[in-house]
């Protein structure tokens, strides 16, 4: 199924950015577990700083409601449907580009594939859909935490600017409230907005407390599954496991083992596709967003050369908004791997 | 299924490096197509330079035989079973390490997961299994070629040494026969062997002639599928699509469109997870192999600190042997995506 | 996935009978196809005579709305979400049995499995959910018809009463409007209602115009798939393909072949799991419904022996209401098999 | 995948009756479990009485060998490959019918679908393949038995002859060794062979000791899965769950519940697709085999009317040989359902 992921607990997402609603359907989940709209709402709101501060001005309410699969706040074992209403449908932002293919976007490939041009701001390809992954993924957040697993994301680079490691200690919330006071970041972001430009970014994720033996060779190794799902996030270009193995020889990167544990973790917690109990280290590279308000050469549906300019709201650094999405998808991947391992115990 | 891949035509591989046989089972293939053992054998032999020249001295015959699913050399539509006999079973190479966990290898994680130590030279986790992927994948090679698709792999880096671009014009065979005469490469490889070291490598794959519209958003995007399968290859650490997006802003990497085509291809042929008709550009990073004949600290099954030394044959640059494996898996991925697209025509 | 079916075009259904909504999500469908709520609404309304005439008095509006996956009435290729609001939520009907396990129903097994008792009239196990299968399945109805395929269902037996074959010529609608005038049926149904009883039934489905070569041996034979999906319908107990093979020898049931075609069709259009071009003949047996207003011995959640009496509305012959459900699921199965065959052309 | 079944532990079968070998590949199985060729061989031999006594004279050795996935007789967690060599390849038996489509067989439909005529005695469609299901399924037999589950098959009818219930107490082996002494059966079988005829049969399976809560609504109900797999067996025409619900009203078939348990078991151990702890009751109807040595009208590949006569060995009652196949597939289904339930504990 093209629009589902998860081997045991399966998430299906649906909805277009400028359609009526977006949402997620969770199948294969436990019964008799408390889930509350409040908790999911809180996590969705966590997504907002990443979408609005410095970023796009689009103001969504993202009000989520659970419609099926629960009774008196507990799951029944039946599929759980969550819906988020789209309030902020400013199709007008995008009207002037309706007949143009925005370079770097899905417009051209979606038109060729689906013989169809849904110009309403990206439609199904829009990053708005990722709200569904956050809403559904956070349902597993506590289950993961209760097993001692902590997922933390760090912004390593914005454009060419390397983020000072001392900021890596901050929780992501505090990091963002302090963003304004980190001068270099403030400057680089503002320059971007003023020059109608956007920047690449590198996000690092470290997962602590993960039990060993997760992952299923040969073709469902944990790094295979993680890359499959995380590279489905818009604007991702690259994924890397462990610390940088470029230009290295084996003496430089060997992880020796003592009876007190591993002496290092170059491999980033994964050996032969299975977790070894050490922290997972994953790095993802995001390209700069392609919607800017600068002029850019493209063609329209009649294949005529034109110059395009997006008047809509755009994101100077789209990688930042991806952080809650990455974490949510990781909760889903991890709970699935943990349940899969349980089968054989 | 942990040991299968492919959405329509499915490949299952099996067998251990020091077991009796290894092989592949192909299900969902066309009927009435000629396939010959000779052709598969030829492709398997192409794998040998990558495994023996400069590399491991292990000398496999890799003689393949088709046992089911054909009649008078044509496929019947039933599953096709290919078997390769293991002749070169030198378990003795590995005996002294049987109770030790070789760092960087699957030993430790496989022991934890399967409660079982198959010390016969890596067993199921060994790179030997990749011969099965080559044998099965090449069945689709001609189908892909007949559609005008050409898959080419290039070695970009060995250790810190960047390979001169002029060599990128060589077919891979010619490249390898000339390797000996490329002094820098010769030197770096020999140094490695003499110092019992091994090197990382970067492989670039360029795919020309691929039709647009391949790939299925949101979770079966073509980059998702490719990363899922290619990162299942031993020693892979990173995958990257398109040209380097690090430290960039959008002006530097925009692919403008004219009615004569795209003006550039930074995105490497993929937009929003769907091919756009331009060449696919994929880069994979391999870590240095962990089996060297240098001493390395580890523990044995009784959790006692010891020093380990592999007397077996090892590979100074494991990325090189992966090239035919990458190409074979790509044939399988591409034929599946092409057939999937066919459904909707 | 427990709550999805369909190999290429996948339907997921969700919702409980006395929850807020029920619905279906269609993934993998064509783009650029017209679908309208009116057409789906019409088909849902066709379901009503089967649910209300003679049958349960529960009066649902079954008003369907499409929320995603369309733009200007055409499919975009993205998942299509249909929702049906539950208006007629008379939980009070069921209150007096809330702590009792209704024999023959899902109550007992669902309680054991999900550790949870959703007493709201059957919840997820209720036949109400089948409205989702009708709503989604009819989307494929025209596609099937345009290929010359006609699916027709006939009621062969109600209780012990065999329906006169002459009525098999009627379209189902006409059959039902005439039901009142078919005395034997009228009598048997009324007796049922008066004595608070319910009856078994046998439904025969004949599919004409189906192309040969549909079905995928060995484990996705068309009879395997059909039985898998149709036996998921509530109250089904048996499925049979072809004409009755009981107590037969081979001379009695051989289908000889002439160059003008088959001389008979005992095998009901399927040979070795693949269609042969002849009409498919399928027969399904439904058990009598278990909810009646007669007293029946059972236990409550405290495992105390009690007598139960359902005051809610019940169905004297549940097999009748299944007819549109059977047909809808068959449209889904058939379109999937036809698309699967297309891959190999 | 067309040639695999099983949701967690997956079996893939392959091979043609007159090809080199047949076999099975088991993926997703436990590690560290003892399996021995002897045990599998013993179970395969159990299959022989069902295939040779009274039945076909084809004498296979059915010698099985395990090639991968084990080390020192214990499973490693890697895929397990079992191969059975075909010794008794009398293609000559079938030569005279090579250009004819044997009515009632797969010949015609396989020719249309695969554009290919593998006349070697049924090829992939032959019942010989079922040996693979027996070989793989018996691996799970002990696991099931250790959970207190007993699977027993009974022959209820051969042709029109109803088997006296007193024989239902015999284990199947003893039943068969006594077959010769059960006069009615002896007579009916001999008449068959003399008149070159064959008979239908009804097999009843009763499964005791199965835990409740197995089965996954809505589309992976246990009856759905069982029917899907069992109807893939050659010559099956019908499957029925529970006791006969034909011509019944609800008073006749209600299963009341007391705190001491159910008062009856008309539903045959399944409610709403989930086991309720009572014995499962399944009945399967087999058609008479179509290969007889009587003349029968058919066409050849040139579409010319001819008369066909099979000189090969044929089976007077093909349902009998299916018994070990049914049981093996049930072990596979049950272990999968049990493991699936384990996920949620």
From Swiss-Prot, chains A, B, C, D:
<dbReference type="GO" id="GO:0005829">
    <property type="term" value="C:cytosol"/>
</dbReference>
<dbReference type="InterPro" id="IPR020541">
    <property type="entry name" value="Chorismate_synthase_CS"/>
</dbReference>
<dbReference type="Pfam" id="PF01264">
    <property type="entry name" value="Chorismate_synt"/>
</dbReference>
<comment type="subunit">
    <text>Homotetramer.</text>
</comment>
<keyword id="KW-0057">Aromatic amino acid biosynthesis</keyword>
<dbReference type="GO" id="GO:0009423">
    <property type="term" value="P:chorismate biosynthetic process"/>
</dbReference>
<dbReference type="GO" id="GO:0008652">
    <property type="term" value="P:amino acid biosynthetic process"/>
</dbReference>
<dbReference type="InterPro" id="IPR035904">
    <property type="entry name" value="Chorismate_synth_AroC_sf"/>
</dbReference>
<comment type="similarity">
    <text>Belongs to the chorismate synthase family.</text>
</comment>
<dbReference type="InterPro" id="IPR000453">
    <property type="entry name" value="Chorismate_synth"/>
</dbReference>
<keyword id="KW-0028">Amino-acid biosynthesis</keyword>
<dbReference type="GO" id="GO:0009073">
    <property type="term" value="P:aromatic amino acid family biosynthetic process"/>
</dbReference>
<keyword id="KW-0456">Lyase</keyword>
<dbReference type="GO" id="GO:0004107">
    <property type="term" value="F:chorismate synthase activity"/>
</dbReference>
<comment type="pathway">
    <text>Metabolic intermediate biosynthesis; chorismate biosynthesis; chorismate from D-erythrose 4-phosphate and phosphoenolpyruvate: step 7/7.</text>
</comment>
<dbReference type="GO" id="GO:0010181">
    <property type="term" value="F:FMN binding"/>
</dbReference>
<protein>
    <recommendedName>
        <fullName>Chorismate synthase</fullName>
        <ecNumber>4.2.3.5</ecNumber>
    </recommendedName>
</protein>
């Amino acid at each position: 199924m093209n629009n589902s992921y998860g081997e045991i607990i399966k998430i299906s997402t649906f909805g277009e950015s400028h359609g009526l609603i977006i949402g997620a359907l969770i199948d294969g989940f436990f019964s008799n577990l408390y889930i509350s709209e409040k908790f999911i709402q809180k996590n969705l709101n966590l997504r907002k700083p990443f979408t609005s501060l410095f970023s796009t001005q689009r103001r969504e309410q993202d009000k989520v409601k659970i419609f099926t699969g629960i009774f008196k706040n507990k799951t029944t074992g039946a599929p759980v449907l969550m819906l988020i209403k789209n309030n902020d449908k400013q199709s007008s932002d995008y009207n002037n580009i309706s007949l143009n293919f925005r370079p770097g976007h899905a417009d051209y490939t979606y038109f060729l594939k689906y013989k169809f041009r849904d110009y309403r701001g990206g439609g199904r390809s829009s990053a708005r859909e990722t709200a569904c992954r956050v809403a559904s993924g956070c349902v597993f957040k506590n289950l993961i935490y209760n097993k001692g697993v902590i997922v933390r994301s760090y912004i390593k680079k914005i454009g060419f600017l390397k983020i000072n490691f001392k900021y890596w200690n901050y929780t992501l919330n505090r990091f963002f409230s302090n963003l304004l006071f980190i001068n270099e970041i403030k400057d680089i972001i503002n320059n971007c907005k003023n020059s109608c430009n956007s920047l690449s970014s590198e996000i690092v994720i470290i997962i602590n407390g993960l039990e060993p033996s997760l992952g299923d060779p040969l073709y469902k190794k944990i790094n295979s599954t993680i890359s499959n799902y995380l590279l489905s996030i818009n604007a991702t270009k690259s994924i890397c496991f462990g610390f940088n193995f470029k230009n290295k020889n084996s003496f430089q990167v060997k992880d020796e083992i003592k009876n007190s544990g591993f002496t290092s973790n170059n491999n980033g917690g994964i050996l032969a596709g299975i977790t070894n109990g050490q922290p997972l280290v994953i790095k993802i590279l995001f390209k700069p967003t392609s919607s800017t308000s600068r002029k850019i050469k493209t063609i329209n549906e009649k294949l005529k050369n034109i110059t395009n300019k997006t008047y809509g709201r755009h994101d100077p650094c789209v990688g930042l908004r991806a952080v809650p999405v990455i974490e949510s998808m990781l909760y889903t991947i991890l709970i699935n791997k943990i349940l899969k391992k349980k089968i054989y115990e």
